[in-house]
Amino acid sequence: MSAALERLNHLNLNHLYAFVAVAEHNSFTAAAEALGLSKSLLSEQLRRLEADLGIQLLTRTTRRMTLTDRGELLFGVAQRMLGELDGALSDVRDLQGEPSGRLRITAPQDFVKWHISSVSAAFIRQFPKVQVEMLADDQFSDLVGQRIDLAVRIGWPRDSGLHASKLCDFQQVAVATPGYLAGLPPVLQPHDLARCEWIGHTRLSTPWTWTFERQRERATVQTRGRLLANNTLAVYRLVLDGAGVSVLPSFLVAREIARGRLVRLLPGWRLPQGGIYALYPSARYMPVRVRAFIESLREHLGREPFRLAQSE
């Protein structure tokens, strides 16, 4: 047996979990609480891991803790390995019964509020052995590094190296409140939007330029505005408050249009269609709980009014 295999043969996985937890939390206290261990036992497990490997993994002072170069290398490998191991073990348990274990999901704040939260509530009622942790974040997360099982992303997918499954399509819709529109001439053509006060979304590459299509016609409008936000939910609130016009996804505004709180502008024209995607690190080792949640979310979205009638 080689020296490397000999070391692996005697390696305690609990010690490796302890090391990964300390590195993830950058704190012995937080890691000990997460693992349900005392700080003294956690320190002893790390000491034994370093002794088994014959290397120093981290340095500690009274004020801070840092990983050594070898510690950084081991952390990256161990984090991925233990994540896949947890998923595989959970999958084996799932095959023997219902889905179980922790499910970490990240999605934009507006989508968590309107959809992920309600799907999660129904999901844990259906599968009581599953714990769902929702991370409302508009930034693109490192799924492997943060041990996230599933990300929901809106719009047009980027080549991130992750597996993607489209859940449904949605329309982009120009909307405003009846009160805001009451003080303006009727908006009958795309160029009429140029005289409106617009609310811009700074995360879009061109927040002020919109191209509308109708059959073979195409009209590009250059808008203007004094309000900008980097969050779809903030733009939505500004529109509802009567601050101006903006383009929002149909899944966010369909109910308000039906209730008369918002007016869809230019219903005979279309903006580019977007998609809602489920992203996950591995299709081969996907735990059953993740697969079951994706199907629950797809079923939920299939009942939602994402496609607005062209005549609205």
From Swiss-Prot:
Gene source species: Pseudomonas aeruginosa (strain ATCC 15692 / DSM 22644 / CIP 104116 / JCM 14847 / LMG 12228 / 1C / PRS 101 / PAO1)
DNA-binding region(s) in UniProt: 28-47
One function term, GO molecular function aspect: NAD+ poly-ADP-ribosyltransferase activity
Function: Plays an important role in the regulation of the production of the virulence factor exotoxin A (toxA), via positive regulation of the transcription of the toxA gene. Acts by binding directly to the toxA promoter region. Besides toxA, PtxR modulates the expression of genes that code for the QS-controlled virulence factors. It negatively regulates the expression of the rhamnolipid and pyocyanine genes, through the autoinducer synthase RhlI, and the PQS synthesis operon pqsABCDE, while it positively regulates the expression of lasB through the autoinducer synthase LasI. In addition, is involved in the positive regulation of glucose metabolism via the regulation of the expression of the kgu and gad operons. Acts by binding directly to the promoter region of the kgu and gad operons.
Entry keyword Magnesium: no
Up-regulation conditions: The level of expression at different time points of growth is generally low. Expression increases when P.aeruginosa is grown in static cultures and under reduced levels of environmental oxygen, two conditions that resemble the environment within the lung alveoli of cystic fibrosis patients. The ptxR upstream region contains two independent transcription initiation sites (T1 and T2), and potential binding sites for multiple regulators. Under aerobic conditions in iron-deficient medium, ptxR expression follows a biphasic curve that involves the P1 promoter only.
Ranges for domain HTH lysR-type: 11-68
Gene3D superfamilies for the chain: 3.40.190.290, Winged helix-like DNA-binding domain superfamily/Winged helix DNA-binding domain
Record's keyword annotation contains Transcription: yes
Pfam families in the record: HTH_1, LysR_substrate
Oligomer and partners: Monomer in solution. May dimerize on binding to DNA. Interacts with PtxS in the absence of 2-ketogluconate. Binding of the 2-ketogluconate effector to PtxS causes PtxS/PtxR complex dissociation.
PROSITE patterns recorded: HTH_LYSR (PS50931)
Signal peptide: none
Keywords, ordered alphabetically: Activator, DNA-binding, Repressor, Transcription, Transcription regulation
GO biological process assignments: negative regulation of secondary metabolite biosynthetic process; positive regulation of DNA-templated transcription; positive regulation of proteolysis; regulation of DNA-templated transcription
Disruption phenotype: Mutant produces lower levels of exotoxin A. Mutant also produces significantly more pyocyanine than its parent strain.
Activation and inhibition: Negatively regulated by PtxS, which interacts with PtxR and prevents its activity.
PANTHER family according to UniProt: HTH-TYPE TRANSCRIPTIONAL REGULATOR (PTHR30537), IRON-REGULATED VIRULENCE REGULATORY PROTEIN IRGB (PTHR30537:SF66)
Database matches in SUPFAM superfamilies: Periplasmic binding protein-like II (SSF53850), Winged helix' DNA-binding domain (SSF46785)
CC per GO annotation: protein-DNA complex
Family: Belongs to the LysR transcriptional regulatory family.
UniProt-recorded name of the protein: HTH-type transcriptional regulator PtxR
Domain of life: Bacteria
